[in-house]
C-alpha cells in the first residue's frame, strides 16, 4: 500500500521533478513553482471541504488558511533538496531546531544541541534554525544555520537577533547565519532604505534570494551562490 504523503512531502516530490526538468534554474523560479502548487492545493482542498458540505466561500477561506500552514515547511523542504547533495558529498549532516527540541536525543544530536545553545543566564535557549548544517569528523562542529522564510512582514529582526547572540559567545561565534528566501513581498530585494534589507544585510553573513530579479550586493546574492559560500566553510 502506497504511503499517503503529507502536503509538504507531496510538494517536495513535485519539486524534485521540477528540479530534474529545469536544473539550477528551478531555484530562481520558485515563485512560479509554488504558484502552480498553490493552485493544485486549493483545488484539492476546496473539493474536500465541499464534500463535507461546507459552503464554497467558507471552503475557499479554509483552503487559504491551510496553505499558509503548508507553505513554510514546503519551502524548507525545497531548500533542503538544494543543500542535501552538497552535504552528502562533504560528509556533512543536517538537522533543525524542531528536532533538537525533542527529548531523549541520541548522543550526536545532543552534542549538536549543546554546541548551539544561547546562554541567557539562568536558562539556555535554542536559536531558531530551519536548517542546521554540521560536521562530525573529527568532532561535532556547527557550520551554519539557515533561516528559510517565504516573506517577513515585520519579522525581519528575528534571525539577526540570533546571529548577534551567537556572535557574543566563544563557543558559537564561528557559526554562520544565512537567510534564504524568495522574498515574495519585495521586502529586501531592491536597494533603498527599507529597514528589513538594511538590518539583514548588515547583521547576517549572507542573504540568498530564490528569484531572478533583485539588486545584488556583497552579502545579498542569488540562491545559486549559497553552495559556493557553504564550500568556503569547509
Summary of predicted features, one role per range:
Residues 149-155, 184-187:
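Short acidic, S/G/P-rich loop/turn micro-motifs used as interaction or catalytic elements
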Residues 1-66:
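Nuclease-adjacent, charged terminal/linker segments that flank catalytic cores
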Residues 168, 182-234:
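Domain-level recognition of nuclease-like catalytic cores that cleave nucleotide substrates
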Residues 131-133, 143-150, 159:
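Conserved catalytic cores of phosphodiester-cleaving nucleases, focusing on short active-site segments
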Residues 144-145, 173-181, 205-207:
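Hydrophobic beta-strand segments of well-ordered beta-sheets in folded domains
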Residues 57-117:
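Acidic-basic catalytic patches of nuclease active cores, encompassing PD-(D/E)XK
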Residues 156-173:
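Short, charged, amphipathic alpha-helix that recurs within catalytic cores of restriction-modification
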Residues 103-127, 135-140:
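Flexible internal linker/loop segments at domain or repeat junctions
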Amino acid at each position: 500500500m502506497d504511503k499517503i504523503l503529507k502536503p509538504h512531502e507531496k510538494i517536495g516530490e513535485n519539486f524534485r521533478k521540477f528540479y530534474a526538468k529545469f536544473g539550477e534554474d528551478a531555484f530562481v523560479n520558485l515563485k512560479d513553482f509554488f504558484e502552480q502548487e498553490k493552485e493544485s492545493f486549493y483545488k484539492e482542498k476546496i473539493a474536500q471541504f465541499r464534500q463535507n458540505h461546507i459552503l464554497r466561500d467558507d471552503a475557499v477561506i479554509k483552503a487559504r488558511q491551510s496553505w499558509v500552514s503548508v507553505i513554510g515547511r514546503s519551502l524548507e523542504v525545497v531548500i533542503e533538496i538544494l543543500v542535501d547533495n552538497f552535504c552528502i558529498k562533504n560528509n556533512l549532516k543536517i538537522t533543525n531546531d524542531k528536532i533538537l527540541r525533542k527529548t531523549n536525543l541520541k548522543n550526536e544530536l545532543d552534542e549538536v544541541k549543546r554546541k548551539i545553545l544561547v546562554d541567557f543566564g539562568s536558562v539556555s535557549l535554542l536559536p531558531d534554525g530551519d536548517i542546521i548544517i554540521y560536521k562530525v569528523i573529527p568532532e561535532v562542529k556547527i557550520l551554519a544555520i539557515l533561516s528559510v522564510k517565504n516573506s517577513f512582514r515585520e519579522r525581519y529582526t528575528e534571525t539577526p537577533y540570533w546571529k548577534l547572540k551567537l556572535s557574543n559567545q566563544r563557543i558559537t561565534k564561528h557559526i554562520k547565519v544565512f537567510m534564504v528566501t524568495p522574498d515574495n513581498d519585495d521586502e529586501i530585494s531592491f536597494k533603498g532604505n527599507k529597514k528589513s534589507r538594511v538590518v539583514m544585510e548588515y547583521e547576517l553573513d549572507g542573504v540568498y534570494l530564490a528569484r531572478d530579479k533583485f539588486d545584488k550586493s556583497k552579502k545579498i546574492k542569488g540562491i545559486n551562490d549559497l553552495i559556493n559560500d557553504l564550500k568556503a566553510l569547509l
